[in-house]
């Protein structure tokens, strides 16, 4: 019998009471408890935007140092020298990609350079008349004065070439404008002070040294500045400039002869100095376009005395042009020819006065030289533009051969007409030789080193140019006439022509050899230099100086 649970007893209590009252018991359902409402979730706070962290630059990987070489038994390991950093040039532009304007303001520069070449070489090519005037003044003191008087004009002409390496340094460091203006001012002072002295020894300094050095500083920048404004028509520009010298040469003999007859030698120097004064003003138009070199960090970082000396030496004397064999041969050939080049200009007038005493217009010979020189410079300018590469040198070979032969023909002329024909050929050869000198230098060493290449060339010509006329004067004193002197003057140009003949052949041979080597070693070829290119015969790329 199961016992009732306490819950059942509680349920029976109210029912029994209802039965006692005779009422039907009502059982109400127990209400279920209402579920408590779930609390609404609180809204989550909006996240505050956090700025993303700045990206940190990744450190560049440092190159591992080269392992030190293992010492070999019996030898000490030499310290490894780190290569010097590549020098940088702070300029307005680089030579690579530079395009000359080929005109425009360049034609004003051409006019200034024309006046420069015309006034300088117009005076120097008329030195034969000045030489005769000097002899007239000095004959009263010394009968055998030809040797001493010849030094005046020879020094002036020789100093133009002797100072050329120094002028190249000033041109590279200071620019064409400052160098040319300073030189023209010095030339003006030299000519003007020559009028205040009658001493031959003092005129060695005033005319020979001062005037000659000033002309050198004024002349060479006129050759270099044309390469800044012309490239495709550089030969034509050089021809126009050189032709200006011929126009002046045609007028200067007549002018100097007229001044000498009327106002004598001293006042003639004063009149000629005005041309140098005008040149000083015109030289201000030489605005350079190509960059000039400056000091590099590697040069400033030199520590040892030897390094500082080498830095300064390389800074002022760029010897890289002599690494090219073709340039060395070319410069030596022209220097050899220069020994007899200037002899006819100095002694021709005196020779004609001695042999053809009835002829008064001896200056006509210098006019003929100037006229055909201008024609030769114009023609050679056009011809050189059409001749590719170093084949232009063959024009110099031909001109030197004819120049030597014509010098030897002077004593063989029996009449004045024959001398006129000889002088016409002399001027033509002079025009061809002078005009193509700068374009050949650009072809040999490139535009960045052309300035010093021309400077060293003219410097090598200085000694034979100075020595030639005095040697001819000494021969005249020894033999009593100019025959041997002019025969002597014709030999060096012929020798120079033979030397120059081999330069294009050697250049072509070296170019083919380098092409064969470059085709084999393409993977090991040098990177292109930003300032130049590798020239045939040069071990290093062309660089600014």
Curated annotation (Swiss-Prot):
Protein's job: Specific thyroid hormone transmembrane transporter, that mediates both uptake and efflux of thyroid hormone across the cell membrane independently of pH or a Na(+) gradient. Major substrates are the iodothyronines T3 and T4 and to a lesser extent rT3 and 3,3-diiodothyronine (3,3'-T2). Acts as an important mediator of thyroid hormone transport, especially T3, through the blood-brain barrier.
Gene3D superfamilies given in the database record: MFS general substrate transporter like domains (1.20.1250.20)
Tissue specificity: Expressed at highest levels in liver, lower levels in brain, kidney and heart (at protein level). Expressed in microvessels of the blood-brain barrier (BBB) (at protein level).
Protein family membership: Belongs to the major facilitator superfamily. Monocarboxylate porter (TC 2.A.1.13) family.
Transmembrane helix as UniProt keyword: yes
One Pfam entry name: MFS_1
Cytoplasmic-facing ranges: 2-102, 171-181, 226-235, 286-328, 384-392, 437-453, 505-545
Extracellular side stretches: 124-149, 203-204, 257-264, 350-362, 414-415, 475-483
Name of encoding gene: SLC16A2
Modified residues (Phosphothreonine): 540
Transmembrane intervals: 103-123, 150-170, 182-202, 205-225, 236-256, 265-285, 329-349, 363-383, 393-413, 416-436, 454-474, 484-504
Membrane protein topology class: Multi-pass membrane protein
Renumbered residue ranges of the record's region 2 X 22 AA approximate tandem repeats: 29-72
Identification of the protein by name: Monocarboxylate transporter 8
Modification type N-acetylalanine: residues: 2
Coiled coil: none
Compositional bias (Pro residues): 46-70
Organism, as annotated: Rattus norvegicus (Rat)
Ranges of the Sequence repeats in the UniProt entry: 29-50, 51-72
Biased composition (Basic and acidic residues): 514-529
């Amino acid at each position: 019998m199961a016992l009732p649970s306490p819950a059942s007893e509680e349920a029976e209590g109210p029912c029994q009471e209802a039965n006692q009252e005779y009422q039907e018991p009502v059982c109400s359902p127990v209400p279920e408890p209402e579920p408590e409402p779930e609390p609404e979730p609180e809204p989550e706070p909006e996240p505050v935007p956090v700025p993303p962290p700045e990206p940190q630059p990744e450190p560049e990987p440092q190159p591992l140092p080269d392992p030190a070489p293992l010492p070999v038994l019996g030898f000490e390991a030499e310290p490894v020298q780190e290569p010097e950093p590549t020098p940088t040039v702070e300029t307005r532009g680089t030579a690579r990609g530079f395009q000359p304007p080929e005109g425009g303001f360049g034609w004003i520069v051409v006019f200034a350079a024309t006046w420069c070449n015309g006034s300088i070489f117009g005076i120097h090519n008329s030195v034969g008349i000045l030489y005769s005037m000097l002899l007239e003044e000095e004959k009263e003191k010394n009968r055998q004065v030809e040797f001493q008087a010849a030094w005046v004009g020879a020094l002036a002409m020789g100093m133009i070439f002797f100072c050329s390496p120094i002028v190249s340094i000033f041109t590279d460091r200071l620019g064409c404008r400052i160098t040319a203006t300073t030189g023209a001012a010095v030339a003006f002072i030299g000519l003007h002070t020559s009028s205040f002295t009658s001493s031959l020894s003092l005129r060695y300094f005033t005319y020979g040294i001062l005037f000659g050095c000033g002309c050198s500083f004024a002349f060479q920048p006129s050759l270099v500045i044309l390469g800044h404004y012309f490239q495709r028509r550089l030969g034509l520009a050089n021809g126009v400039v050189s032709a200006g010298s011929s126009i002046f040469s045609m007028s200067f003999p007549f002018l100097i002869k007229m001044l000498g007859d009327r106002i004598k030698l001293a006042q003639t120097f004063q009149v000629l100095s005005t041309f140098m004064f005008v040149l000083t003003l015109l030289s201000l138009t030489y605005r350079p376009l190509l960059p000039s070199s400056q000091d590099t960090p590697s040069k400033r970082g030199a520590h040892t005395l030897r390094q500082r000396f080498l830095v300064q030496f390389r800074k002022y004397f760029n010897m890289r042009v002599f690494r090219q064999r073709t340039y060395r041969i070319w410069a030596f050939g022209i220097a050899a020819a220069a020994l007899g080049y200037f002899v006819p200009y100095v002694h021709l007038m005196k020779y004609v006065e001695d042999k053809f005493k009835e002829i008064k217009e001896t200056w006509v010979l210098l006019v003929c030289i100037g006229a055909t020189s201008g024609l030769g410079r114009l023609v050679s300018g056009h011809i050189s533009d059409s001749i590719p590469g170093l084949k232009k040198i063959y024009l110099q070979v031909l001109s030197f051969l004819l120049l030597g032969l014509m010098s030897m023909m002077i004593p063989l002329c029996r009449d004045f007409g024959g001398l006129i024909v000889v002088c016409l050929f002399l001027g033509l050869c002079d025009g061809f030789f002078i005009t193509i000198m700068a374009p050949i230098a650009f072809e040999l060493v490139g535009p960045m080193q052309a300035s010093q290449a021309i400077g060293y060339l003219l410097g090598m010509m200085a000694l034979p140019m100075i020595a030639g006329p005095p040697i001819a004067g000494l021969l005249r004193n020894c033999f009593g006439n100019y025959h041997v002197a002019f025969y002597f003057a014709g030999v060096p140009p012929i020798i120079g022509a033979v030397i120059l003949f081999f330069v294009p052949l050697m250049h072509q041979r070296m170019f083919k050899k380098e092409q064969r080597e470059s085709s084999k070693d393409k993977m090991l070829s040098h990177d292109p230099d930003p300032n130049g290119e590798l020239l045939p015969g040069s071990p290093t790329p062309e660089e600014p100086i």
